[in-house]
Amino acid sequence: IREEFGRLDVFVSNAASGVLRPVMELEESHWDWTMNINAKAMLFGAQEAAKLMDKGGKIVGVSSLGSIRYLENYTTVGVSKAAIESITRYLAVELAQKGIAVNTVSGGALDTDALKHFPNREELLDDARKNTPAGRMVEIEDMVKTAMFLISDDSDMIRGQTIIVDGGRSIVM
């Protein structure tokens, strides 16, 4: 990146994976797999990105409602997303003096390829359709617009925050 472009302005940590099982069926390898892909990628990816942000920049993590709410079989993913949100706050403070803003965007139920792996996918989507105060499900474009705002100059004074994009669903759960 430095050779080709000279610097990096934006880093979005969107790596995600996980093992969907009840707590008592989890193995250490499930935990390690999920934490390494989700939380570890955010921390070490952000470290490397920050080294290339000589003139400041923006770092955005991606989380989900499972970080703050119980979702069936979502333990490893939910905990890893909570770790991303915590890492966001630490990075925001420690990178502020370099002019780097760090935030996370957290989404409600999105009909993505990842959701196809959930055994209760249809139930989750039906719940989102029926119970989201905004009257519709969150779309990928809603998440993209929020991330685009977070990397814009308009968000310069937003630091260390997790912006929940769920149409209000999490406040009525």
Regions found by a protein language model. Give the residues of each.
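Residue(s) in the substrate-gating loop at a strand-loop-helix junction
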Residues: S64
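Short, small/polar-rich loop/turn modules that mediate ligand/substrate recognition or access, typified
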Residues: V12, A96, A101, I158-G160
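Short C-terminal tail/terminal secondary-structure segment
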Residues: R69, M148, R159-M173
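Active-site helix of classical SDR
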Residues: A46, S80, T88
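A conserved structural motif in NAD(P)-dependent oxidoreductases
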Residues: T132-M143, D154
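Alpha-helical segment proximal to the catalytic Tyr-Lys
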Residues: K51, V93-Q97, D156
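Substrate-binding pocket helix/loop in short-chain dehydrogenase/reductase
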Residues: P22-V23, H30-D32, L124-A128
